[in-house]
Structures are given as C-alpha cells and as structure tokens.
Amino acid sequence: MPIRHALSTTNIALVAVFAGLIAASTLWPGAELVSGVPITLQTLAVLLAGAALGPWRGAAAAAVYLIVGTAGAPIFAGRSGGFAAWTGPTAGFLGGFVVAAFVTGWLVRSMRTRGQLTTTGIIGACAVGSLVVLNVIGWGFFTLRLQTSIPATAAIASPFLAGDIIKVFIAGTAAAAVHRAYPQLLGSVRSTARATESPAPVVVAATAGGNSVS
C-alpha cells in the first residue's frame, strides 16, 4: 500500500474507529474460566476489523489498540492496561490479534479481488483468523509460558470453542453487511463481486475513468 494512500484521512479515521471498537469490546465484563483465560468480545472486534478493512488497516487497528493499552489505558480484558498484560500466559492472544486481523483481511481481500466475495467466504476467513491463527498463537504461548502439555492445553481450550465459533459467524455476517453497504471499502475488483449470496448482489464494475457501482 503506497504511503500516501495509507496515511489518507479516510484510512486514519477507519483505523481509529476500529481500534476504538476493539477497545469498546472490553466494556462487557466477560467471564473467566478456571484456566484464567477470560472470555471477551475482543476476538469478534478484531476479526471484524480485518474482514471489513482488509489486511493492513485491520492489523493497524489491532496494533493501535495494543499500543494504547500497553501505554496504560485500561482497555485490555478485565479493564486492565499497561505492560504487565504482556507478562502473563494470555499475552499470546494479544500479539495474535494483529496477525489474526491481517490474515483475515488478506483472505477477504483476495476473494474480493477475484470477484468471489460471499458471506460464506467471509465467515470462512474469520474462522481461519480465529480458530487457526489466533488459537495457535494464543494457546501455543499459553503452553510454553505455563509449561503445560499439549493435551492439557487442549482440555483447557475446549470450553472456549463454542463461543469462538459464534463470534466467527457474527463477525463474518457483520463484515458482509459492511461490504454490501460500502462495496468500495477494499478497493477495485477484477470482475463482478458479491458481498453476500443474496439474489440481488452488489456489482462493482471497473471503467476506464475509475470505478462505477451499479
């Protein structure tokens, strides 16, 4: 992404809004299981940022959130903040937010570029970002930090699976609605693109003078 385009007012505003959304997701008190890993809405917000904004802006929103939280703002899980959050066993999930947002956004943008963007595809991208990328990084660090065995970590992680799946579907569906309302959010496409699988899809056609929406 060209630096001038990346630093445009629109992109900065979008990154700020979604960073704020991730921070706001921690206002829900959530719940904490015996493992000490909290159940929060952060993952949902991170996936939505990546799926809606694309890889770079989505990852930037997650990074801004982490920077502000590390600086001391009480916007991490449990309304905590500061560098101490990076010393615990759940630090891998914090770092994984940036990677998960990037991968989710990259998958969505790739489908968009090919003109194959559907609700199912966006949900699938969110599933990869959450169930594969974020879980591997987060639970992998958890295992190393506490020196637990992989089977033991799997047993601890299993109660979170149902909630993760629900958040994947919500984030994917919400992102599809965003792209249906703002079909140019991820830029131009090579051919006809659909933001949902509805009978009346949004069509974005490239013209010699720019992009037109019909």
Task: List the predicted regions and their residue ranges.
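Hydrophobic transmembrane alpha-helices
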Residues: 1-59
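Alpha-helical transmembrane segments and their lipid-water interface positions
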Residues: 61-65, 73-76, 104, 137-138, ...
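Helix-loop junctions at the membrane-solvent interface of multi-pass transporters
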Residues: 28, 52, 78-79, 107, ...
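Membrane-embedded alpha-helical hairpins and interfacial helices in multi-pass inner-membrane proteins
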Residues: 35, 111-205
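Interfacial aromatic-anchored transmembrane helix boundaries in multi-pass membrane proteins
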Residues: 26-38, 66-100
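Short helix-perturbing small/polar motifs within transmembrane alpha-helices
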Residues: 24, 83-134
